[in-house]
UniProtKB/Swiss-Prot annotation:
NCBIfam families: PRK08561.1 (NF006331)
Cellular component annotations (GO), alphabetically ordered: cytosolic small ribosomal subunit
Name used for this protein in its record: Small ribosomal subunit protein uS15
SMART domains the record matches: Ribosomal_S13_N (SM01386), Ribosomal_S15 (SM01387)
Chain segments carrying region Disordered: 1-21
Gene designation: rps15
Bias type Basic residues, positions: 1-10
Complex formation: Part of the 30S ribosomal subunit.
Highest taxon of source: Archaea
GO biological process: translation
Protein species of origin: Caldivirga maquilingensis (strain ATCC 700844 / DSM 13496 / JCM 10307 / IC-167)
Keyword Ribonucleoprotein attributed: yes
Length: 150
């Protein structure tokens, strides 16, 4: 498992398919896969969970191999793309939970350090997403606003 504030990656995780071709045993057409992605998104699953469900339950190794589109591209075409990217939202949820913990345990210094590292990462990601046009330029992170939303 990697550390949150280091630039190295962890060693655990599933191995991506070796070939970039559609497996011969796959019985789903690109339209079927897109329909499944949209259906799962409407049921409230995040893009990463959609990929896991398609891999584990439907045997679809990679959506991009089959459809030539990423899951978020399919969701964007159908108007289902989340306003805030999934990785940023996960960090915001983590920061909200740490703040909630610190309200009950104000002397927990390791939690304070964790909050500092998490919020630093949030600010770096927001800067990146503004630069690439994913988030609007007037987007700001305020812990109070997101504490109510989550």
């Amino acid at each position: 498992m990697p550390h949150r504030s280091r630039h190295k990656r962890g060693s655990s995780g599933s191995v991506r398919p070796a070939t970039k071709t559609i497996p011969p045993w796959l019985s789903y057409s690109p339209e079927d896969v897109e329909r499944l992605v949209v259906e799962l998104a409407r049921r409230g699953f995040t893009p990463s969970l959609i990929g896991v469900i398609l891999r584990d339950q439907y045997g679809i190794p990679l959506v991009k191999i089959v459809t030539n589109k990423r899951i978020t591209e399919i969701l964007e075409e159908n108007g289902l793309k989340p306003q805030i990217p999934e990785d940023l939202m996960a960090l915001i949820r983590r920061a909200v939970n740490i703040r909630r913990h610190l309200e009950e345990h104000p002397k927990d210094m390791s939690a304070k350090k964790g909050l500092l590292l998490t919020e630093s990462k949030i600010h770096r990601l927001i800067k990146y997403y503004k630069r690439t046009g994913v988030l609007p330029l007037d987007f700001t992170y305020s812990p109070e606003r997101f504490a109510m939303a989550t």
